[in-house]
């Protein structure tokens, strides 16, 4: 058997951090060896990553690669002559570039500068974006590839429109959400906005004959998003609470507001990688809690027609739903709601989900959703129960 290995340099923008080697072992497990260290300052090294830990660095590199369960992952990688298990190849082609942070990995003889390759400022490979969204097309080899470090399972693609970096996220029918996920993102954003929460703004648009939710990038070349999972030794709610408490009361209250909001909209997909903090890339210091995003799997994402027969039918169904974090929405309400969250929820009283200019569910369905939303917010405010 021929064993494959390759050496890379981990860089923070144009600063060399360390040299490492990845081996593709005979048992299919990659091994990483740190060969040389250059600039290991805490202000430069990936935050919350233990300095000089080879196993942790390898896991970090794996996590910034395209998920194996991503929609059209085989089509994306196939267009680049890669496979989903080819970590060395994916790092070589994509250079580990991300829209989350300023890190990248390059081959040891690479001479290019970050300004000419980073995803924040440079043109995307539009043909790969189309493959990522539709599963169809051919790579034309033009532009940087933004799809190799984007998390999530649904079909999605980064686009550059009028100077903004924008994410288009669609809905693959095999996930049995019937095309409702974009509506859910839009309605959830409108509720969070009404509450006064720090939330990513979502719009709706049609691309390649498919409805998509659309949002602008909330990071930039000077500000990173770091998911909360990176800061935890144990992946449970207690650890999350302790982390946000350690940052101060404002951080903790922001976290509590997120948990109450999730309970209100029955967001069953709040996991440890879709919330976190924003980090100043110049100092590697935490700035604030990241804006809320990724609410497509909530009570607004229910395609089954029979659920909309009545408010009672819909409520009976969503009362069977449970959050990823902890064991019930009702317990989260009781544990995380204080006066600030009550004030935020009170702003939803009498609020109606707005119609989009172009793309909408039927009036009957929207009426059911509005009735359910009002019933939930009243129940929470009156009784702290759902």
Features from the language model and the residues they span:
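Phosphate/dinucleotide-binding and metal-coordinating scaffold of catalytic cores
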Residues: 1-260, 264-266, 278-386
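Conserved protein-kinase catalytic-loop segment immediately C-terminal to the catalytic Asp
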Residues: 271, 276-278
């Amino acid at each position: 058997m021929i064993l494959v290995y390759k050496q890379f340099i981990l860089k923070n923008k144009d600063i060399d951090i360390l040299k490492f080697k990845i081996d593709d072992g005979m048992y299919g497990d990659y091994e990483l060896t740190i060969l040389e260290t250059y600039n290991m300052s805490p202000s430069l090294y990936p935050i919350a990553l233990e300095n000089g830990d080879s196993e942790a660095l390898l896991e970090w590199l794996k996590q910034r690669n395209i998920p194996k369960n991503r929609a059209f992952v085989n089509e994306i990688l196939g267009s680049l002559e890669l496979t989903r298990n080819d970590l060395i190849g994916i790092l070589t082609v994509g250079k580990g570039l991300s829209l989350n942070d300023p890190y990248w990995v390059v081959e040891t003889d690479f001479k290019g500068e970050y300004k000419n390759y980073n995803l924040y400022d440079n043109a995307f490979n539009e043909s790969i974006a189309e493959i990522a969204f539709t599963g169809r097309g051919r790579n034309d080899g033009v532009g940087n590839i933004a799809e190799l470090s984007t998390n999530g399972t649904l079909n999605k693609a980064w686009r550059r429109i009028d100077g903004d970096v924008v994410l288009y996220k669609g809905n693959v029918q095999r996930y049995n959400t019937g095309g409702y996920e974009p509506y859910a993102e839009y309605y959830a954003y409108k509720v969070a906005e009404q509450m006064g929460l720090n939330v990513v703004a979502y719009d709706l648009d049609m691309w390649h004959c498919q409805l998509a939710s659309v949002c602008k990038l909330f990071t930039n070349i000077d500000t990173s998003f770091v998911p909360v999972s990176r800061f935890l030794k144990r992946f449970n709610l207690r650890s999350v609470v302790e982390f946000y408490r350690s940052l101060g009361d404002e951080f903790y209250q922001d976290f509590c507001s997120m948990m109450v909001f999730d309970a209100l909209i029955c967001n069953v997909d709040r996991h440890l990688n879709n919330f976190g903090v924003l980090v100043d890339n110049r100092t590697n210091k935490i700035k604030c809690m990241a804006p809320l995003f990724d609410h497509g799997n909530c009570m607004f994402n229910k395609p089954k027609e029979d659920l909309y027969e009545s408010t009672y039918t819909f409520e009976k169904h969503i009362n069977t739903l449970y959050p990823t974090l902890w064991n019930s929405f009702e317990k989260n309400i009781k544990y995380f709601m204080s006066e600030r969250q009550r004030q935020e929820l009170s702003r939803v009283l009498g609020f109606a989900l707005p119609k989009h200019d172009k793309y909408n569910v039927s009036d009957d369905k929207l009426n059911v959703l509005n009735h359910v939303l009002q019933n939930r917010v009243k129940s929470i405010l009156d009784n702290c129960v759902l």
